[in-house]
């Protein structure tokens, strides 16, 4: 009885009994303890008998029997002898599977350094001994001696000696000292190290030194030494004296037909090691000459290197076919390695795949499954049913019946399949909606039928796509499939909370056609009593579908009690809309139906249905919409003919006008009035504008037609042109595509992104000539090449994102923080790009939201802002709200539900255990394939909008200028002299309505705080050049402007005007290199003028390419331009757009020419210059001056004597997120990354909720650098998880010690993934060798917190349905700890009282059995 209980206990303990995985160095004794015997011979198996050779690599005595429960010689067979060791062949009688787990070992005749600790940079052995890698290699590979014991000589420990030096030393000191070669020497040195003393010594050094590099070096060594001390690893274990041998079934030898064998490469590598080792043993026994032994030792070292990591040092050892052998390191790393191939993803049983076709008659929760497939997939279920029903006596009989496909089998199949959901998956599975559950409907044929509405989620179309089917087997799996993965439960997209079950294409066209109205249609003006009558009128031909009629419509409105009240009104509508109303669920307002329904409107319909009526109604409604849409699309008979593409008559006038303008510019260029760059820009602007005008004329022509109404008067109505209807409804095509069909194709781009200045004036209807076609091929082909690249890049980005965010899970309800991000609407120019409600919807308020201008609380803090509350915000015109955010969440190792807010895919506050990190990564990665790879084109047509050159106000209100400096010119207008000026217009309530960036040199007609009316133009500037504005009036004095040296003079042939162009420093003669062309302003007497209220001279340094059109001594007034600097031409400036931009942001890469930001607040001045750089000084009000060297070619935004604030831009450029974090803090960097990423996605029309990007930013910010460690466990300058610092600080606070000081650090996603606490997760991501080496040396523990680690060790993940399981394990563990403590104390007292009765025993046995069942 007792044994049985024990046996069951042993069975149930599988992967449950560990909570932490620790990795470390193996000591020789440990390796021997794993081993079941020493492998002495290189033989594998006997080629005649196929039996393993004794003591060889496949030896049965060491590794276990080849056949189950049978020894090698056949003396003992069968189960009854299990555990017996055969005296003849020495094999233990047991199962074969022990050959997968029993290890052997090889006793090495000479120690060998482990290549990972030697060559994986930084070399651990080198760091420990404080020697360069080159020197260690010289010793290891027998080129030099190293002193291990200096004795009384004047040699030093660790000194290298050549052969000659060694012999000399031996002559001088005989055996006073000891010097060795090879791994033994290194082993001796490592053995002789006193780690603690070394640590102390380094700590003292660290206190004394001041040099930064030295400090870095010492901290590196100190960290390594401390890791050794703490982990209990011994340094000499990095040199191996015993080599473990992998169990034979993990490096199999498979006989092929024809007497040959296929073998794992590892066997070759092991054979090599054993051969050399045995030869070395013999040589040592024979006392062979030193040089031979040395050579053999070196070869042994090399062969062990190859076994562990082939190709890491020297040339890789190759097999018979010139292919490098796969070593142990190669087995685990890379896509084909153990981690990614077998642990993170596996192939599964009970799956099939087939082509998909449309199932327009299916319900949303159904899919059509071919009978043949179903029969195969549900086989075991059918067998079981056949047996239990008594149709078959044995499994064999059942099998026969199924193979013969007897009639009864089909009945049973239908029964088995009923309510058994199956999973459908379409590769690539980019987000969680790529796998959904459906109920199968058996169909004839061989193709899976898919419901059209889920195509958007799968990104599927029916041009030959295939899908895979999986069968959830266990009851739990079926439950999860039905409750969580059913397509009806996934109506909303997790990326943005909008419905993803939206009709597209035909359905949209059908509904649009159905709800259009037509002037003077048949039956116009009829009075109908209800929608049924309207349908009757349409079916009998009394009225057309589009006719305007009056119908009595009954709406149902929910009252306070939640019941529906009927409300009937006579409504002006059309027949089609009335018919559509018949499928509307109760509780929807008719106003949503009484309009022309395009794709957006239909999406809104479904969204409203979901929010108002709940999931079930919404799903049924979506199905009805689809059926109706298909029916009426068929009725509409929409088709496209060539005559539908109507070319506007105005087109040719517009084009000829543009050609004249271009000719004029060309003339100006030839007469020297404009530069080549300006000409190019202007030509492109002209054509871009012409294209817009043609497009507008075409759309006006297409979109409207004039008809005669009932009164006999002409009336305009939307056109019934098929092409227009398709684009207008959102079914297919866009205005930009129609423009190419019937307008003009417009400007094209070259492959490098610059724009070709001759546009294609033809369109597809007229057809292109050869030249036009040739120009347009660039764009088209680049598009194809891009697509291929894009897919790979996008997949890689997704992989990195998932990896960095995988362990972020909702672990608690509320962390209690008051922190958050302040949200304001995003306004660019005169348009509100993103309204406030979109930004705060589904977030939790971090502080009470007050009614503007009062102290009245509108919404208390910690409230989830839903649609209704957002309406309240809009009604009270609130324009900034502080909301909780994951970036500021205080939870350690996870986030709380309140900081995350609404679960976008479900519409309520997020549940605990939801894997928000993975969802965020998928939401950002999935649209990645829709982003462009570079600059933005539409089918190659360059979209260069005419550049802005003025601000025209759209709303009446008040002007506000931010960080503006200006001078007032003699027309009393303001001329800006500051760089990053922002101009906003606010309305009467103080809400920001418009927001513009105004460049340096712009002329403003209104100042700060002045009123403007809508339509006024309040700022003007030249978009193609940047002026240098005079801030005082006076006379020009040229300094260092010397013709031929620093400037060239260009004279216009026609006008005779001459202008001076400053040369770039690189182009000047040597004499002119150090001169600085400057315009100085002096008064009438030639004295210097200072800028008003400063002691700074009024002088302006001119950069290269600047054009001066004034003469020396000319008079200038305030605000006049002194010179102009041409701006770069459009198109050639390569804006990194699309995917690479997103990747750069998440990788936190520093841009090529980053903006230079002010490190401190203070007054700017310039110090002594060096050859290529300027010295910028910032003097704060108190404290020491900060100085920075800036290259001369950088244009500065500050003048001497200006006051700057910390974080202000000193020189323009792309800002580095690291700088933003350092100077402006976490919130600013979050805002920056979120906005920049959103800009890229918005441009492509992709909607992603901000919080997904914030989740990734939180993971990028999870490390901190310790700046003041005090007496804590941390080192200064060490990189630690923020959560760990917070935990330590909480403890210190409780003890009354000062908190550890730290600075947050921003890591790119790849770096952040590799720097995660879990070494298993990091190793399965990238750079496996390096991660494992580091972890082993440090003796790291993996707490198995994240998802990846748990998948790899084969457990449920601590998220979703596995969250509770892990919580319970955690609780049990705590209870067990307490019980263990108690039992130690109480064992004595309990022993007397505790007697177990037979009943108790059987009860506990039953419990054990149940537990064992559960475990299985």
Curated annotation (Swiss-Prot):
GO cellular component entries: DNA-directed RNA polymerase complex
Disulfide bonds, paired cysteine numbers: none
Enzyme Commission code: 2.7.7.6
Residues at which Zn(2+) 1 binds: 71, 73, 86, 89
Binding-site residues, Mg(2+): 461, 463, 465
GO biological process: DNA-templated transcription
GO molecular function, one term: DNA binding
Source organism superkingdom: Bacteria
HAMAP family with a match to the protein in the record: RNApol_bact_RpoC (MF_01322)
Subunit composition and interactions: The RNAP catalytic core consists of 2 alpha, 1 beta, 1 beta' and 1 omega subunit. When a sigma factor is associated with the core the holoenzyme is formed, which can initiate transcription.
Protein name: DNA-directed RNA polymerase subunit beta'
């Amino acid at each position: 009885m007792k044994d049985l209980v024990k046996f069951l206990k042993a069975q149930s303990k599988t992967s449950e009994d560990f909570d932490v995985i620790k990795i470390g160095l193996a000591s020789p004794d440990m390796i021997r303890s794993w081993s079941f015997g020493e492998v002495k011979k290189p033989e594998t198996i006997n080629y005649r008998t196929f039996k393993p050779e004794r003591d060889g690599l496949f030896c049965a005595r060491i590794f276990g029997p080849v056949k189950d429960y049978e020894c090698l010689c056949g003396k003992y067979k069968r189960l009854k002898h299990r555990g017996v060791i055969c005296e003849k062949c020495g094999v233990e009688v047991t199962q074969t599977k022990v050959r997968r787990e029993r290890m052997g070992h090889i006793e090495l005749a000479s120690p060998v350094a482990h290549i990972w600790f030697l060559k994986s940079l930084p070399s651990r052995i080198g760091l420990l001994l404080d020697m360069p890698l080159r020197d260690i290699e010289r010793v290891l590979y027998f080129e030099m001696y190293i002193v291990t014991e200096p004795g009384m000589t004047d040699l030093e420990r660790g000194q290298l000696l050549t052969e000659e030096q060694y012999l000399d030393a031996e002559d001088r000191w005989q055996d006073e000292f000891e010097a060795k070669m090879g791994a033994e020497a290194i082993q001796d040195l490592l053995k002789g190290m006193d780690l603690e003393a070394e640590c102390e010594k380094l700590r003292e050094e660290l206190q004394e030194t001041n040099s930064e590099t030295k400090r870095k070096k010492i901290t590196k060594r100190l960290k390594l030494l401390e890791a050794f001390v703490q982990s209990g690893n011994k340094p000499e274990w990095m040199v191996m004296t015993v080599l473990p041998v992998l169990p034979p079934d993990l490096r199999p030898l498979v006989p092929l037909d024809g007497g040959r064998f296929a073998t794992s490469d590892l066997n070759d590598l092991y054979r090599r090691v054993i051969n050399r080792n045995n030869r070395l043993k013999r040589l040592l026994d024979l006392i062979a000459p030193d040089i031979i032994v040395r050579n053999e030792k070196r070869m042994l070292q090399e062969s062990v290197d190859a076994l562990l990591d082939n190709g890491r040092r020297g040339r890789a050892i190759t097999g018979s076919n010139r292919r490098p052998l796969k070593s142990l390191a190669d087995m685990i790393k890379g896509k084909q390695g153990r981690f990614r191939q077998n642990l993170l993803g596996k192939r599964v049983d009970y799956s099939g795949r087939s082509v998909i076709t449309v199932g327009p008659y299916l319900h949303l929760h159904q899919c059509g499954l071919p009978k043949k497939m179903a029969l195969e997939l549900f086989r075991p279920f059918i067998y079981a049913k056949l047996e239990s029903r008594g149709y078959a006596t044995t499994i064999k009989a059942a099998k026969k019946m199924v193979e013969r496909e007897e009639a009864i089998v089909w009945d049973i199949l239908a029964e088995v399949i009923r309510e058994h959901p199956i999973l459908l998956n379409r590769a690539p599975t980019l987000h969680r909606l790529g796998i959904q559950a459906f109920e199968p409907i058996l169909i004839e044929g061989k193709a899976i039928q898919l419901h059209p509405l889920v195509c958007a989620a799968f990104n599927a179309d029916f041009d030959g796509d295939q899908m895979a089917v999986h069968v959830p087997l266990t009851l739990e799996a079926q439950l999860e499939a039905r409750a969580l993965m059913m397509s009806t439960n996934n109506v909303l997209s997790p990326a943005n909370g909008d419905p993803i079950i939206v009709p597209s294409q035909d359905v949209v066209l059908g509904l649009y056609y159905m709800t259009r109205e037509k002037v003077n249609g048949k039956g116009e003006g009829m009075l109908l009593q209800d929608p049924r009558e309207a349908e009757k009128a349409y079916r009998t031909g009394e009225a057309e579908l589009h006719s305007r009629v009056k119908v009595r419509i009954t709406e149902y409105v929910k009252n306070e009690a939640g019941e529906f009240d009927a409300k009937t009104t006579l409504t002006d509508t059309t027949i089609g809309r009335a018919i559509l109303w018949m499928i509307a669920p109760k509780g929807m307002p008719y106003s949503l139906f009484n309009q022309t329904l395009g794709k957006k409107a239909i999406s809104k319909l479904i969204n409203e249905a979901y929010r108002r009526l709940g999931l079930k109604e919404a799903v049924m409604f979506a199905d009805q919409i689809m059926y109706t849409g298909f029916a009426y699309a068929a009725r509409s008979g929409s088709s496209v003919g060539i005559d539908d593409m109507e070319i506007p008559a105005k087109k040719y006038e517009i084009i000829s006008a543009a050609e004249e303008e271009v000719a004029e510019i060309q003339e100006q260029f030839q007469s020297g009035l404009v530069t080549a760059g300006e000409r190019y820009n202007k030509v492109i602007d002209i054509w871009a504008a012409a294209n817009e005008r043609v497009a507008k004329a075409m759309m006006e022509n297409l979109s409207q037609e004039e008809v005669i109404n009932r009164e006999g008067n002409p009336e305009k109505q939307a056109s019934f042109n098929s092409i227009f209807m398709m684009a207008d409804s959102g079914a297919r095509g866009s205005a930009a595509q129609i423009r190419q069909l019937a307008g003009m194709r417009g400007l094209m781009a070259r492959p490098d992104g610059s724009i070709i200045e001759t546009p294609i004036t033809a369109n597809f209807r007229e057809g292109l000539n050869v030249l036009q076609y040739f120009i347009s091929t660039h764009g088209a082909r680049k598009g194809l090449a891009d697509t291929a690249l894009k897919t790979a890049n996008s997949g890689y980005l997704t992989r990195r994102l998932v990896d960095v965010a995988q362990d972020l899970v909702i672990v608690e309800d509320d962390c209690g923080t008051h922190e958050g991000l302040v949200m304001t609407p995003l306004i660019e120019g005169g348009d509100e790009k993103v309204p406030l409600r979109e930004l705060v919807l589904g977030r939790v308020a971090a502080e009470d939201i007050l009614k503007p201008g009062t102290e009245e609380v509108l919404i208390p803090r910690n409230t989830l802002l839903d649609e209704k509350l957002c309406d309240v915000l809009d009604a009270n015109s609130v324009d900034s709200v502080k909301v909780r955010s994951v970036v500021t969440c205080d939870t350690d190792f996870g986030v709380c539900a309140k900081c995350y807010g609404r679960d976008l895919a479900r519409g309520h506050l997020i549940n605990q255990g939801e894997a928000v990190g993975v969802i965020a990564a998928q939401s950002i990665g999935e649209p990645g394939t829709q982003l462009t790879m570079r600059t933005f084109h539409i089918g190659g047509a360059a979209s260069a909008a005419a550049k802005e050159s003025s601000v025209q106000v759209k709303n009446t209100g008040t002007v506000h200028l931010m960080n503006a400096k200006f001078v007032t010119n003699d027309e009393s207008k303001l001329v800006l002299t500051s760089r990053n000026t922002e101009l906003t217009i606010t309305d009467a309530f103080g809400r920001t309505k418009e927001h513009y960036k105004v460049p340096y040199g712009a002329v403003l007609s209104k100042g700060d705080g002045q009123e403007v009316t809508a339509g006024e133009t309040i700022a003007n500037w030249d978009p193609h050049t940047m002026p240098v504005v005079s801030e005082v009036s006076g006379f020009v004095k040229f300094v260092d402007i010397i013709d031929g040296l620093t400037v060239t003079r260009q004279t216009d042939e026609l006008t005779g005007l001459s202008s001076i162009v400053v040369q770039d420093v690189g182009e000047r003669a040597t004499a002119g290199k150090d001169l600085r062309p400057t315009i100085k302003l002096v008064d009438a007497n030639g004295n210097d003028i200072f800028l008003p209220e400063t002691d700074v001279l009024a002088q302006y340094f001119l950069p290269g390419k600047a054009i001066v059109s004034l003469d020396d001594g000319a008079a200038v007034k305030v605000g006049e331009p002194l010179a102009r600097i041409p701006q770069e031409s459009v198109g050639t400036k390569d804006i990194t757009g699309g995917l690479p931009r997103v990747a750069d942001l998440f990788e936190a890469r520093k841009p090529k020419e980053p903006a230079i930001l002010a490190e401190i607040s203070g007054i700017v001045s310039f110090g002594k210059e060096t050859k290529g750089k300027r010295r910028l000084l910032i003097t704060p009000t108190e404290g020491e001056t900060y100085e920075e060297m800036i290259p001369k070619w950088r244009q500065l935004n500050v003048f001497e004597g200006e006051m700057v604030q910390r974080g202000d831009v000193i020189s323009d450029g792309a800002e580095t997120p690291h700088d933003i974090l350092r100077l402006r803090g976490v919130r600013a960097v979050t805002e920056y990354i979120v906005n920049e990423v959103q800009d890229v996605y918005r441009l492509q029309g992709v909607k992603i909720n901000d919080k997904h990007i914030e989740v990734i930013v939180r993971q990028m910010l999870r490390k901190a650098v310790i700046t003041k460690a005090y007496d804590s466990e941390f080192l200064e300058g060490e990189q630690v998880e923020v959560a760990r610092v917070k935990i330590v600080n909480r403890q210190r606070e409780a003890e009354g010690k000062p908190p550890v000081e730290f600075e947050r650090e921003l890591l790119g996603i790849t770096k952040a993934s590799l720097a995660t606490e879990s070494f298993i997760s990091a190793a399965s991501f990238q750079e496996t060798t390096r991660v494992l080496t580091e972890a082993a040396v440090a003796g790291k523990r993996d707490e198995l917190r994240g998802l990846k680690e748990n998948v790899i060790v084969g457990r449920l993940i601590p998220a979703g349905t596995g969250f509770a399981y892990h919580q319970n394990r955690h609780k049990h563990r705590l209870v067990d700890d307490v019980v263990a403590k108690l039992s130690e104390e109480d064992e004595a007292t309990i022993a007397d009282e505790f007697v177990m009765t037979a009943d108790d025993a059987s009860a506990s046995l039953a419990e054990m059995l149940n537990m064992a069942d559960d475990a299985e």
